Amino acid sequence: MNSTMSDEPDALSVVNQLRDLAADPLNRRAIVQDQGCLPGLILFLDHPSPPVVHSALLALRYLAECRANREKMKGELGMMLSLQNVIQKTTTPGETKLLASEVYDILQSSNMSDMDNVNEMNYRRRKAQFFLGSTNKRAKTVVLHIDGLDDSSRRNLCEEALLKIKGVISFTFQMAVQRCVVRIRSDLKAEALATAIASTKVMKAQQVVKSESGEEMLVPFQDTPVEVEQNTDLPEYLPEDESPSKEQDKAVSRVGSHPEGAASWLSTAANFLSRSFYW
């Protein structure tokens, strides 16, 4: 990479931009169909910086939510092998191992029979737990209803708050119903998520639970903040002057509303990836 150009994007800013675009369901097909972005995300899985690897996995997790993408993603050169390497590498943080295993499970199950699918996913989970070690327990899912989660800038604030919590593996926003589905380590309390979201000063979280009759209920968290262990190995995800919040509406709507704009940005990302990895 040519570091002499002051306007040259670095690896973290590029992968974060891809992650933010992949967070919007309208963009997922276009990103996977682009010739440079999916191979680039695979190469990022072998990047020496843990935040780059984790952000690439979040992007892949978003892309894999689109069923139409899964076969192409699974068949992309190096995808499954790179995911295995992340899971098995001894230096990979525990949350990153779990996220890589989750993406692997989704892609591996894309063309299996139901029984093969169950057996393979159970095997992957056992293997991930082995590499995580005895101090890391199985992940759990927490569904949050977030008052105030009503636009893209609020979503970015919420995302930044969650990324700072040690033990958060992945999350998916459901903006239409003001919800966020969060995968966390089982030893992390859901109250920590509420504390982090409350720290934004403009949003407040309640937990969505099901009653015995199957009806959904909103359960408020205690008003007393709990101590949140910070994810010290991750930098602030984007520097303030590069934060996507100011341009989020424009950036996220590009694929659906302005294909030429999205193509231009994806081309820029692909050129960066080409210069960085293929010489």
From Swiss-Prot:
Gene3D superfamilies: Leucine-rich Repeat Variant
UniProt repeat feature ARM, residue ranges: 36-78
The organism of origin for this protein: Gallus gallus
InterPro entries per UniProt: ARM-like (IPR011989), ARM-type_fold (IPR016024), Armadillo (IPR000225), ARMC1 (IPR016617), HMA_dom_sf (IPR036163)
Any coiled-coil regions, as ranges: none
Location in or out of the cell: Cytoplasm; Mitochondrion; Mitochondrion outer membrane
Keyword Membrane: yes
Gene: ARMC1
UniProt biased composition (Basic and acidic residues): 243-252
Functional description taken from the UniProt entry: In association with mitochondrial contact site and cristae organizing system (MICOS) complex components and mitochondrial outer membrane sorting assembly machinery (SAM) complex components may regulate mitochondrial dynamics playing a role in determining mitochondrial length, distribution and motility.
Pfam families per record: Arm
Protein name in UniProt: Armadillo repeat-containing protein 1
Disordered: region residues: 236-257
One Gene Ontology MF term: metal ion binding
A GO-annotated cellular component: mitochondrial outer membrane
UniProt keyword annotations, A-Z: Cytoplasm, Membrane, Mitochondrion, Mitochondrion outer membrane
Entry superkingdom: Eukaryota
Subunit structure: Interacts with mitochondrial contact site and cristae organizing system (MICOS) complex components IMMT/MIC60 and MICOS10/MIC10. Interacts with mitochondrial outer membrane sorting assembly machinery (SAM) complex components SAMM50 and MTX1.
